[in-house]
Design a protein with these regions (language model features):
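N-terminal Rossmann-like NAD(P)+-binding domain of SDR-like oxidoreductases, especially those catalyzing
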Residues: 1-126
Length: 126
């Protein structure tokens, strides 16, 4: 078991998230990624496949319970998971609301329950 501080990155297999994963590992964090690979790609993390300080969980953020072990003991959460693209959001508003709003609520509840010190939320303008 590592003594490194723990960071959670939602959407960590996406373009922005995977770069955050690289930076956090470089800065000495143990990183737990949750990404259902709907928009992200495992290939974005392929160069890290043998890194013992990286964990990839392919669940949807909407299934996280407040006491989920993924977030337990984490110091920081970087939340990048969500569905982008404007046109499909107009055609499928319920799915977008569920993934983007309720998914964020699930991640926030986990962070609150775990006593996370820093929560960073980022979203694209799409």
């Amino acid at each position: 078991m590592s003594n490194r501080p723990i960071a959670v990155v939602t959407g960590g297999a996406g373009f922005i998230g995977s770069h955050m994963v690289d930076l956090l590992l470089e800065k000495g964090f143990s990183v737990r990624v949750i990404d259902n690979l709907t928009g992200g790609r495992e290939s974005n993390l392929a160069h890290l496949k043998d890194n013992p300080d990286l964990t990839l969980d392919t669940r949807d953020i909407r299934v996280l319970e407040p006491d989920d072990s993924l977030v337990a003991d984490a110091e920081n959460v970087y939340h990048f998971a969500g569905i982008g693209d404007i046109v499909p959001s107009i055609e499928q508003p319920t799915e977008y609301m569920s993934a983007n709003v309720m998914g964020t609520v699930c991640v926030l509840e986990c962070a609150r329950h775990a006593g996370v010190r820093k929560f960073v939320y980022a979203a694209s303008s799409s």
